[in-house]
Amino acid sequence: QYLQREFSKIYSGIGGNEPNSQIRLTLGDTRTIQVNIMGEVSVPGTYSLSAFSTVFHALYRAGGVNKIGSLRGIKLVRNGKTIENLDVYEFIMKGKMNDDIRLQEGDVIIVNPYESLVEIVGKVKRPMYYEMKPTETVANLLEYAGGFTGDSYKKAIRLIRKSGREHQVFNVDEMDYSVFRLDDGDLVTVDAVLDRFENKVEISGAVY
């Protein structure tokens, strides 16, 4: 419609309510660009990609991020300057693709090792390892894990932290979920709700 509208300004037969001419557009061979993919990917190197390719396309061609690669801060360098830090979690968790911009000739994609990996187990919907940013908290981790299951104890979680010499154990209350920050190697456990009643009353004898 855009092309038809623009061409109709020059060729009268294309526009109007009853046009007597048509536009047929065929896309031929697309231009290719050279992009360098470095760091923690399966197959780092220089790749020839379509000029319509984005960072996600390039990572796919390189075999994806390896076991120690970061998904939270993938750098796109253009003309010696970092122009984007791509957070794959924004796409996986929220469906946002704002950072997945189109690549240009000579772009460099750098995948650094992750900084913080935390495991959450127990009564959450997606128990597994998650990469966390330095400012993220227990609340962020619970969001990534899909939230509590129906039989979980939601008032507190247990956290085991490896300090380098010994293990530290924390009981984090619900009110602190949004402020308690996580460290690399933390283990968070969400227990099941206790098999008891909070407000149980027992009545015995002759009751009328």
Predicted regions and their residues:
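Ser/Thr/Pro/Gly-biased, low-complexity, turn-/loop-rich segments
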Residues: 1-208
